[in-house]
Design a protein with these regions (language model features):
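N-terminal secretory signal peptides that target proteins for export/translocation
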Residues: 1-9
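Bacterial N-terminal signal peptides
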Residues: 8-21
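Noncatalytic, solvent-exposed loop/strand surfaces
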Residues: 23-445
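Intrinsic disorder/low-complexity segments
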Residues: 3-4, 17-18, 434
Length: 445
């Protein structure tokens, strides 16, 4: 671990604080990949329902290198990661698209897949620091005001090389005390928690589960959820999907609380996981099997609860890459081919759905629910804006399942650039990161 606390950095930090004071946590910040509550739901109003390169573009900046991470937004700062001149890097912009700082770190480890890069993992912030993670194993804490390095470490140098067949996809998550990274791969797999301020290792929990070949590999991001004392849960709980299992851990020490297996009953050796779990009230929702299944797990219990806590399973619907969004007891699922369904979290039954026009481009970005609408973005940079169903009767939908109403399309957005990052919605603005650009979309000032 390297501490960046030189006098020069200290002077820079003092100057930066004078110009930039972190704001308290607000619902209209977007601190991590899946938003303030890690559920794909954004706050705010006044978002546009259509855009193009010549319509509703507040600004667009060309990035100096490639990346696939989703921006983190806090107050006036927008942070993205990318590669710059062979280095892992991060850039901080203000809300007007002006570059405020850029920070180069260690040597970049290039991506293998045409959709991916060595900078796939999304940054996470608390408004004071921003933590960035890369395929190279580099994990760093930066000052969000000026990009000054607070500390750095490298997981692969500490714990062993990456054995994933493809490019790192998991993003770091924050608990009250730690920044946590999940490493799930063929061979040694683990969760590691580092002190947010100093970078010291707080705990490391092995996560070695019986899964064949590529099925042992996961690109998903854990979910941090407030524990329910009535269910015997700790104050903070970590939910992790990968290696044919969902596991829940005490975020204070990494110890496993419960596990559910059986997600790969036939032992398929290529069932790697990409989409992440999401928590819907009393249920953990786990998309799996390369987009073929969704499993709902009741929270609570101890040990192996596979036989007792699976609430329902859908084998006719799933999401391979996009992670579902959750709101008001409903789950919004977007498949890689643009089939979108809204499910009742308690029963798994479809309440309303739509199948977007077929296209050779897939959906990798995850859906976002905001201001009475849903935004889904295709890899060619085309987004569909749908009306979020505000009034649905689950029983009526079940009784008339062959005559379900479709989700209404409100508008389309186009940027004509490769897009796998998830849209970020903050304070009436949509920040869309493509492979080599950052767009800000909204009504003109």
């Amino acid at each position: 671990m390297v501490l960046g606390r030189s006098c020069a950095w200290a002077m820079l930090a003092v100057c930066a604080v004078a110009a930039f004071s972190p704001q308290p946590a607000r619902a209209d910040n977007w601190p991590s990949w899946r938003g303030p509550a890690l559920d794909g739901v954004a706050a705010g109003q006044g978002y546009v329902s259509s855009w193009s390169p010549t319509e509703h573009v507040r600004w667009r900046v060309k990035l100096p290198g490639l990346g696939a991470s989703t921006p983190a937004v806090w107050g006036d700062r927008v942070v993205v990661t990318c590669a710059i001149d062979g280095k892992d890097a991060a850039i901080g912009f203000d809300r007007n698209g002006k570059e405020v700082w850029r920070r180069e770190l260690g040597e970049v480890k290039p991506g293998k897949h045409k959709k991916a890069t060595g900078c796939n993992s999304s940054p996470v912030t608390d408004g004071q620091h921003v933590w960035v993670y890369y395929k190279s194993g580099e994990l760093a804490a930066l000052n969000i005001a000026d990009g000054a390095v607070v500390w750095t470490t490298n997981l692969q140098q500490q714990f062993g090389e990456d054995t994933l067949w493809w490019d790192l996809g998991t993003s770091p998550v924050l608990t009250s005390k730690a920044v946590i990274v999940a490493v799930m791969q063929t061979g040694p797999s683990y969760l590691a928690a580092f002190d947010r301020t100093t970078g010291s290792l707080l705990w490391k929990q092995d996560r070695m589960l019986d899964a064949p070949e590529e099925a042992a590999q996961s690109y998903s991001t854990p979910v941090v959820v407030a524990g329910n004392a009535d269910k015997g849960e700790p104050t903070e709980m970590l939910v992790v999907l990968g290696a044919d299992h969902v596991t829940a851990h005490d975020a204070a020490n990494g110890k496993e609380i419960w596990r559910v297996g059986g997600l790969n009953p036939t032992g398929h050796k290529y069932f790697r996981s990409i989409a992440s779990p999401v928590v819907a009230g009393d249920f953990v929702i786990a998309p799996y099997a390369r987009g073929e299944t969704i499993t709902a797990i009741r929270r609570g219990g101890k040990g192996d609860v596979t036989a007792s806590h699976i609430a329902w399973v859908r084998t006719d619907l799933g999401a391979d890459v996009p992670t579902p969004a959750v709101r008001d007891g409903r789950i919004l699922v977007c498949t890689d081919k643009g089939k979108i369904e809204c499910l009742d979290a308690a029963t798994g039954k479809t309440l309303v759905k739509i199948e977007l026009p077929k296209n050779r481009n897939a959906y990798s970005a995850s859906p976002v629910i905001v201001d009475g609408r849903v935004i889904v973005t295709r890899e060619d940079g085309e987004s569909s804006v749908l009306a979020w169903p505000t009034q649905l009767n689950p029983q009526a939908a079940a009784d008339h399942k062959d005559d379900l109403k479709e989700l209404k399309v409100l508008g389309q957005g186009v940027v004509d650039e490769m897009t796998v990052a998830t849209p970020v919605c903050v304070d009436g603005l949509i920040f869309l990161r493509t492979h080599d650009s950052l767009w800000c979309l909204g009504e003109k000032e």
